[in-house]
Every structure is written in C-alpha cells, then in structure tokens.
From Swiss-Prot:
Transmembrane segments: none
Protein's job: Mitochondrial GTPase that mediates the disassembly of ribosomes from messenger RNA at the termination of mitochondrial protein biosynthesis. Acts in collaboration with MRRF. Promotes mitochondrial ribosome recycling by dissolution of intersubunit contacts. GTP hydrolysis follows the ribosome disassembly and probably occurs on the ribosome large subunit. Not involved in the GTP-dependent ribosomal translocation step during translation elongation.
Disease implication from the record: Combined oxidative phosphorylation deficiency 39: An autosomal recessive disorder due to mitochondrial dysfunction and characterized by global developmental delay, axial hypotonia, dystonia, dysarthria, impaired intellectual development with poor speech, and deficiencies of the mitochondrial respiratory chain enzyme complexes. Neuroimaging shows abnormalities in the putamen and caudate nuclei, along with subcortical white matter involvement.
Further comment: This protein may be expected to contain an N-terminal transit peptide but none has been predicted.
Any one Gene Ontology molecular-function term assigned to this protein's record: GTPase activity
Span of domain tr-type G: 68-353
Source species taxonomy: Eukaryota, Metazoa, Chordata, Craniata, Vertebrata
Protein name: Ribosome-releasing factor 2, mitochondrial
C-alpha cells in the first residue's frame, strides 16, 4: 500500500550536507506499511541526509539498497598517514558534506569527539553511511595510534573490504604492519592508497616496493603518478590508459578532466603507461586462470585490444581471493585522487554476498548480527552498532543475545552518520545499524531473532558437524568470533574529588568500559582505591579527560605504573584444609595442588588446569566450576607485586569435600591452597617488552642510539628510508615512559616513534630487586 511518510527534524541543527530549520517536512511516497504516529526526532537525530536536497529517492532504496550494491569498508593505516583527511574528502565528493573538513582545523566529521578534534588524531571509529554512483558505502574511519588498536580490531571484524592508506614518503610503517596482520586474520580484501604524493620526499616506487617487501603482498599498479612532491598534478589510469588532471583553479578538487593518452601529446607517458598495463595484464593472468585463458585465446598478440571491463573483472576476482592488492595514489590534502579511489572501492572490493560466511547456512533467513561497538549517550542510553549478516532488524523488535542468554527489545533503529543519527523503519542483511534500547548487550555479542532460532541453528550446525566428523562442540560455533581484547600494559589509581562523588565516578567508568573494553577497572584490595588499566599513556590520558568533559568530574590520577606479570621457576606442592561451621552446617574441604611453570608464546596470561586420575569423577562434576574459580582467583594477584600470574599449570592431586559444603567454601580453600603453593615456589617478575620503531634524521641518529642504550634497548636493525634512518628494536616498557618528550628534545622535534607489545620477558635479578624495593618503599 502506498502511503505518505513524513520525516521531521527538530531543534534547528546543522548537519553536514544539509541545514535543517526548526521543522522541515518532506512527503515521500514509499511502498511501506502504514507507520504508527511518530514523535519528532530529538537532538542529533535527523531525517536521512540523502532525502534532503534536490535528489529525492524512494525511502526503501535509500535505506536498503540491493545487497550487491553495498560496500562495508574501513580505512586503516599508521598514525598521520592521512586516514581522516581521506575520509573527509570522500564525504565531500560523495555529497554528504558541503565543506571540506580538516584535521588541523578541528572541523572533521568522523573525528567527532572533542579530544579527537583537539589532538588531530582518530580515537573512536565513527561509522559513516553515504552513496557513490548508485552504491551504498558504510565507511569506518579507524585510529592509527597503537593505544587504540582495539578500535581497529573491533571494526575490522565486521568489514567486507578495506582501504589501506600509506604516506608515500614513508611507505609501510610500524602500525601499518599491525593493522595489516589484523586484516589478514579476518581475511579482508584490501586496496592500497598511496597518499601525500605532493609531500617532499614522496616516492611512488619506494612506497610500492615497501608494500612488496614488508607486507609480502603483490601490488597491482592501477595508477601511476604524474609528477611527485611539488610537481604532483594528477594520476594516470593504467587500465583505461587515460590521464586524470585536477583543475589548478579549483580549490575543492571537484573539477578534474579525464583525457585519453595520445602519442602526439604524451609520447613518454603513453609508453610508460602501455608498459605498466602490459605488466598488469601479465600479473593478473598469473593469478587468475579464467583471465589467463581469455588472454591466451583472444588477446595474446595485442594486449591493447583487451577490453578494460575484462581486466577490471579479473582484478576484482584477484582482490577477493587476496592474492594481490590494487594500488592507487593521490593527495587527500590537495584534493587529488579521491574520486578514482571511490570508484575502485565499488569496483574491486566485495559486496556482503561475495564474502563466504560459513555460519549463515545455519541461520537461513533468520536474523544474525554482531554487536561490534557500544557507545553511551546521555539522552538515549547505550547505543549499539551492529553488522547485520542475515535477516532484518526493525524498531520494537525483540532479539535474543546468545552470549548473555537474554532477550531484549530494540526501541529505535538508526543509521549512523558520524555523530548525527538518522531514524529508519528497517535494515536488512549487509548493512550496519545503530540500535537504541539494548541495555545488556556488550561488544562482541551475537544477536539472533529468538532463543528458538538459536536452537534451530544449533541443530543445523550439529548435523553439519556430524557429516564432517568434527570433534568440537558445533553449537559453540554459533557465536560469531568476538573482538579479541588485548591486555592492558599501564595502570594508575583514580580518585574522585570527594567520597560523595565516588558513585558518580563508578557510573562514569562503567559507561566508559561499555564503550571501550580495553579499559579495565579494578579495586585494589589493600588500599581500596580504584585502579585504571589501559593500553598506553595516551589511552589513560584520554579516559581522564573524558570523565571531566562528559561527566563533569575532576578526578585525580596517581602515578602511571607498568603492568608487570609474575610466574614461578620450579614445581611445588601445597595442601590446605578449610573447616568452618556456619549456623548448624559444617563446611570441610581438604585440597592438595601442584603448581609448575610452563612455556607459552602468548602475551595473554595463560593458566592451565589439570586433574589427577585419582580425583573422584562424581565429586569433580559437581565442584569443577568452584575449583576453577578458586584457581583463577588465586592467580589474579601474585605474591611479589600483586600482579597477575601467567605461564603456570595447576594440577589438583586430591580433593575431599564434606557433604553439604558450599561451592563458595570450595573456591576459597582451592584459592588459598594455590596461593600457598605460589608463595613456596621460586618467583620471577615478567616485564612487558615493546617492539620499537624510531624514524629519525641521519644527523640525530647517534644521540638517539645512545639514549636507547641507556634504556636497555636492544637494536635489531637500522634501515634507510629516504633521507631518514629507521631504528628497529626492543625496549622494556618501563624504560620508555615519557619517551616522546625526550625524543622531541634530542631531535628538535623531527623524529617519530611507534610502540607495540611484543612479549613479556623475565627481569634480571638486579632490576627485579630494585623494582621490589621501590614498590615496598625501601628505596
């Protein structure tokens, strides 16, 4: 039934690409069921940006385009490679902003938090939805700072493709390697954009070679630059054999002309492009059998006759297979090369239906979605970003959370436009939605339509497992792979201005933890103080700043400290008995455990549980959860520093439980026995060891190396990058605190560095004793 749908926007707000007056109303004929009377939208909500303007489309085609026309992509790179600037240009050329946002001016759309705009870095990934030439693009702008790798991980989990942005003068940098590995883990097809081609020192050849050498990827050169550094003025489309030149008189880069390369006008450029195109055809033919057969059968004599469409289709297949990566170039800041990049996104990156998600066979057409991000809004409460893999989401829909085993109701459904949110009637598979009303859903939770739907999918998965003779529990595979949360490496105490503000602080921290699972909060059992644990100095600083800005609390941070770990060096046994009478009930437990060291390569705390054959299976069945809770509790705080225990195996050798003994008493006895064993053993402090990469001018190399030697640094190699030297090595985290200030002083502000957690290593006895004495107040 055709109906008139009114879209209201209240409260006189400015939205990129549109200016909404106090009340603006558009009538749109849409083939939809009649909707209930709707309350006008509040602050930061609007009608769809695409609906306001001259081009008014049908509501359904705007909200739910064909799945083949959807692209869920992310932008990933090293810090300062130009991710946010590239995103702002994409939004501008797609028509969703009317002016060019600039990181340096602090007026970008995707960097919508105050700290992001002030610091010129991206912290939280803003999801942006826009259209480009008939395609719906859901774009995630991700951070490049090492303190915020969880944001990258969280977003990569739900992407179908990605754009890797590189600084053309630096090539592949430290954080690029980290993000590239994360994308490999999720099998995400990528295209590369060599940004900053206008920058002094930019080198297309060097950047391409670094992709080949450092990322072990096969670059497909789809473009060549016309000039470099100050002479950069455009790009050559290798596939089409055309040159793209931007109008020098145009400040916004919208005006550019595409001209075919002709022998009379550009003989040298035509020759170079022809050679590049022939090399591209040969490279793609080596990677794609279907294309190789086509070339050999019809175009082996003359590659010039090969239609561009055939080559583009083959490049699309190769990109999806991840056997090579298309490479484009430009300058986002100078507004060159962004429109061809958008064309490449729609042409070469996959649609949701081209991605092979095995779990979809179990859900059929039922709802299956992943909650990949949670934000907290003061007016609307928790906002949950979801990637919809199958089915449809609507407002007032009851959904089942498999992880939490609970049912909740979506009150409102929004389409994200940075910090502007558009209310919509439904979203289908392939889209990214923003939901309101889910108070118990957390990052990484799997969402389905109902508990019965989950059970039906579990039965299908189980049958599939039996066919393939799988040993693992197939029902567990219904849970979509969640976000791997890294362990924090720094911690500090945080105190409110007064005891009366403690509940407010706890509320603020609870909200921030829902948004950022890499932020850990714990209570120190000795001092009773609240302890913040984070991924780095900047991470802790940002959290402190947000508590002040968003919750109005002037908190006080204690000194920043390194998060050490502890382990043991030898095997020990311990026995403990707990005998208590509460009321008229006696609780009696006797436990014997053995603790021994194990070797692992994980940076996550590893504790293994084992049970001796002599343990009564019936007794173990009713008490296993209590036993393992007790072991886990004992390993949270080691005997030396109170740091977590890792790389230890605990074996339960004997267990005697008096009838009627509570599980709480069992846990308490096991915990006390394990702690006794850990205290008896020879103990070792483990410190976080960081991968370090310092990029420094040749003139300042010597003082930087001398300083790193004093910091117990272990230099692995020194590379040459253009006119700079790149120092690569390892350094203990404790020695690198405040290093940015020192490095600026040593190099007159010309050097940069990147850190990433490598592993935990044993401290030498002298450093360990110094640390223990300092913590105990003896020094």
């Amino acid at each position: 039934m055709l109906t008139n749908l009114r879209i209201f926007a209240m409260s006189h707000q400015t939205i990129p690409s549109v200016y909404i007056n106090n009340i603006c109303c558009y009538k749109i004929r849409a083939s939809l069921k009649r909707l209930k009377p709707h309350v006008p939208l509040g602050r930061n909500c609007s009608s769809l940006p695409g609906l306001i303007g001259n081009d008014i489309k049908s509501l359904h085609s705007i909200i739910n385009p064909p799945i083949a026309k959807i692209r869920n992509i992310g932008i990933m790179a090293h810090i300062d490679a130009g991710k946010t600037t590239t995103t702002e240009r994409i939004l501008y050329y797609s028509g969703y902003t009317r002016s060019l946002g600039d990181v340096d001016d602090g007026d970008t759309v995707t960097d919508f938090m105050a700290q992001e705009r002030e610091r010129g870095i991206t912290i939280q990934s803003a999801a942006v939805t826009f259209d480009w030439k008939g395609y719906r693009v859901n774009l995630i702008d991700t951070p490049g700072h090492v303190d915020f790798t969880l944001e990258v991980e969280r977003c990569l989990r739900v992407l179908d493709g990605a754009v890797a942005v590189f600084d053309a003068s630096a090539g592949v940098e430290a954080q690029t390697l980290t993000v590239w590995r994360q994308a490999d883990k999720h099998n995400i097809p990528r295209i590369c954009f060599l940004n900053k081609m206008d920058k002094t020192g930019a080198s297309f050849k060097y950047a391409v070679e670094s992709i080949r050498e450092k990322l072990k990827a096969k670059p497909l050169l789809l473009q060549l630059p016309i000039g470099e550094a100050k002479t950069f003025k455009g790009v050559v489309d290798v596939v089409m054999k055309e040159k793209l030149l931007w109008n020098c008189n145009s400040n916004d880069g919208k005006d550019f002309e595409r001209k075919p390369l002709l022998e009379m006008n550009d003989p040298e450029l035509l020759k170079e492009t022809t050679e590049a195109r022939n090399a591209l055809i040969e490279q793609v033919a080596d990677l794609d059998d279907e294309f190789a057969d086509l070339v050999l059968e019809e175009f082996s004599e003359n590659f010039d006759l090969l239609p561009a469409e055939k080559l583009q289709t083959a490049i699309h297949r190769v990109t999806l297979a991840q056997t090579a990566v298309p490479v484009l170039c430009g300058s986002a800041l100078k507004n060159k090369g962004i429109q061809p990049l958008l064309d490449a996104v729609t042409m070469y990156l996959p649609s949701p239906e081209e991605r092979n998600y095995e779990f979809l066979q179990w859900y059929k057409d039922d709802l299956c979605a992943l909650a990949f991000k949670v934000l907290h809004d003061k007016q609307r409460g928790p906002l949950v970003f979801m990637r919809i893999y199958s089915g449809t989401i609507k407002p007032q829909l009851a959904i089942h959370n498999i992880n939490g085993n609970c049912t909740e109701r979506i009150s409102r459904l929004l389409l994200p436009f940075a910090d502007q949110h558009v209310e919509i009637p439904s979203l289908t598979a392939g889209n990214i939605a923003l939901t309101v009303g889910l108070k118990h859903t957390a990052t990484g939770d799997t969402i389905v339509s109902s508990k019965s739907s989950a059970l039906a999918a579990a039965r299908r998965a189980e049958r599939e497992g039996e066919k393939k003779h799988r040993q693992n529990n197939e029902a567990e595979r219904l849970l979509l792979a969640g976000v791997e949360i890294p362990e924090p490496v720094f911690f500090c105490t945080i105190e409110p201005p007064s005891l009366s503000k403690q509940p407010d602080l706890e509320h603020a921290l609870k909200c921030l933890q829902r948004e950022d699972p890499s932020l850990k909060v714990r209570l120190d059992p000795d001092s009773g103080q609240t302890v913040l644990c984070g991924m780095g100095e900047l991470h802790i600083e940002i959290i402190h700043d947000r508590i002040k800005r968003e919750y109005g609390l002037e908190t006080y941070l204690g000194p920043l400290q390194v998060a050490y770990r502890e382990t043991i060096l030898n095997s020990v046994r311990a026995t403990d008995t707990l005998d208590r009478t509460l009321g008229d009930k006696r609780h009696l437990v006797t436990v014997e455990v053995e603790a021994r060291p194990i070797e692992t390569s994980s940076v996550m705390p590893v504790i293994e549980f084992e049970y001796a054959e002599s343990i009564n299976e019936g007794l173990l069945k009713v008490s296993q959860e209590a036993i393992e809770n007790g072991i886990h509790s004992a390993c949270l705080q080691g005997p030396l520093l109170g740091s977590p225990i890792q790389d230890v195996a605990i074996t339960l050798h004997s267990l005697t439980i008096h009838p009627g003994t509570s599980t709480t008493m069992i846990s308490a006895c096991v915990s006390r026995c394990v702690q006794k064993a850990l205290k008896k053993a020879d103990k070792q402090v483990l410190e976080p060891l960081m991968n370090l990469e310092v990029t420094v001018a040749r003139d300042y190399l010597s003082p930087v190396l001398a300083d790193l030697a004093q910091r117990r640094g272990n230099i692995q190699e020194i590379q040459t990058r253009q006119d700079n030297k790149v120092v690569i090595g390892f350094v203990p985290l404790a020695e690198i605190m405040g290093y940015s200030t020192v490095l600026r002083t040593l190099t007159s502000g010309s050097a940069t560095f990147a850190l990433e957690l490598s592993t935990y290593q044993a401290m030498n006895p002298q450093d360990q004793n110094t640390l223990l004495n300092r913590r105990s107040g003896l020094t």
